Amino acid sequence: MDKSIREFGKRMDTAEDKLVLVDYAEGFKSILDLGAGTGKISRDIAEKCGAHVDAVDLEFKDNCQNSELITYYSQDINTFLSTTKNKYDCIVLSAILHELSDEYIHQMFSNIQDIMLPNCRIIIREPFVDDILGPVLPKDLSRFIELVKNNLPAGKAIEFAQTPKLNSGKPLNINDFVGIDWINFCFTISYGEASWEREKKELRYARSLNWCKEFFNFSKRPFTGFQILPILDKTYKKHFINANLPAEAFDLIQYTGMLVIIDYSEIEK
């Protein structure tokens, strides 16, 4: 089967745009939402598709309450994938790859292959920052493409969307950032005040488990616009040399997104 990448023409770069992926979950009955967060997408899928959704994240299940169609698992993703007995015909990953190291993603995709039903569909939505931000974040699009191509079996097609968007804010000076290994830099994007509060809670929780480090007291900052919360994975010894970074440094200026749809008629390992 061809594993081609082609222009898809859908916007995947804002909070509203991510709901496009709900359309691609229609027709499936056993759906897994990895990195579900508040459960907003899980609920939208369950209500629109009438399907049962298993939602997996460390916590924050606001929108999954009182829904008979959603089962929420407060677990690490790879822990869940390696222990669950459930099988799924649709697996959703919305905006989680940028929070994970390459090694974690490799293991996650390997685990996913063990829980796929025949004719399974994998839906991956991913926002990422454009070149205007320089090397402080994983700006190279090929990282996401190669992670998918190299760690998942071939499917019917891989569909890819890229849409630049200009936001208000100040351009960054890449000289403000020194000594950062940006290839494996982990970050999380917040689109609104509610998600910003959730991201801060998640950061504090991860920090309490010694999974990451926090810089510039981000967990105490109010929401001031479309923002990036920097997280450093504990497996990499990274640090900021310039400690006088301006507050505006993590306000996003330009960003893009991608949507990947992979359909399987049979699973090849």
Spans of model-derived segments:
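Class I SAM-dependent methyltransferase Rossmann-like catalytic core
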Residues: 1-18
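Conserved class I S-adenosyl-L-methionine
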Residues: 29-37, 123-150
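Class I SAM-dependent methyltransferase SAM/SAH-binding core
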Residues: 38-79
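A conserved beta-strand element that flanks and buttresses the S-adenosyl-L-methionine
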Residues: 92
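Short catalytic micro-motifs in class I SAM-dependent methyltransferases
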Residues: 95-96
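Conserved Class I S-adenosyl-L-methionine
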Residues: 201, 205-207, 215, 219-265
